Amino acid sequence: MNLKGYTRIEGVFVPESITAGRQFETDYINVRLKENRVYTDAEVAELPKINTQHPHYKEWQIRRTSFKRLFSYLAAMPKALNILEIGCGNGWLSNSLAQLPNSTVAGSDINLNELQQAARVFKNTPNLRFFYIDDYKKIPGQERFDMILFAASIQYFPSIKQILNSCLPLLNTDGEIHISDTHIYRPSQVTAAKQRTYDYYNILGCTEMSGYYYHHTWDEFDSFNMTVLYNPGSLLQKLKGNSIFFDG
């Protein structure tokens, strides 16, 4: 498969010119190592299942429940789905969604290290591709999607309005945007949340990461047609045409 303006590097489609993201990638991998969130190929292949002794076992149980809810929702749709995951990391969720019958999945991120791991681990999934994308106004091939998913990733985008407005033209007529596993705040909560984030990264010795983390509030979605599907304090959001749904 050849895409104009993209080169395939270790299984990942990479634009011929990269305009942003490399410093974030370096800082992000550094903090992931300190958090014990860099997984071996063997571990990634099994996610969201993970050893009960792993320090993040309970977190992965929550992610597994969230995934099952999303998978059931999508499996009930009476059509083949073309899916884009934004912020796919090591690709476990993109690969899991690629198990939907007749689906096609594109996983994207600006973390080339994790993308290459994803391409390596899931190389035998024929309906799955991975892209390094730093500008979602420049999706390769003018492709359109039935679903765009942000799973624990929208907090790394500074503007909800900007990223969602960039994504809307990428949807098919009845397409949906989903946002999951991200906490959305009331305005009165933001100051304290920012301090907690700074304190957390300060303990890890990675205060630069606090500058990449954005504490979005519910009112940022006011210009969109949004529906909350599930909200135990976090969210999944589904955007259909101009509508959005949240599911934690």
Predicted regions and their residues:
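N-terminal auxiliary segments of SAM/dcSAM-dependent transferases
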Residues: 1-38
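Conserved alpha-helix/loop element of class I SAM-dependent methyltransferases that forms part
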Residues: 59-79
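Class I SAM-dependent methyltransferase SAM/SAH-binding core
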Residues: 92-137
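A conserved beta-strand element that flanks and buttresses the S-adenosyl-L-methionine
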Residues: 149
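A short, conserved alpha-helix within the catalytic core of class I
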Residues: 157-167
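Conserved beta-strand signature within the Rossmann-like core of class I S-adenosyl-L-methionine
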Residues: 174-183
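Conserved Class I S-adenosyl-L-methionine
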Residues: 191-213
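Short alpha-helix
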Residues: 209-229
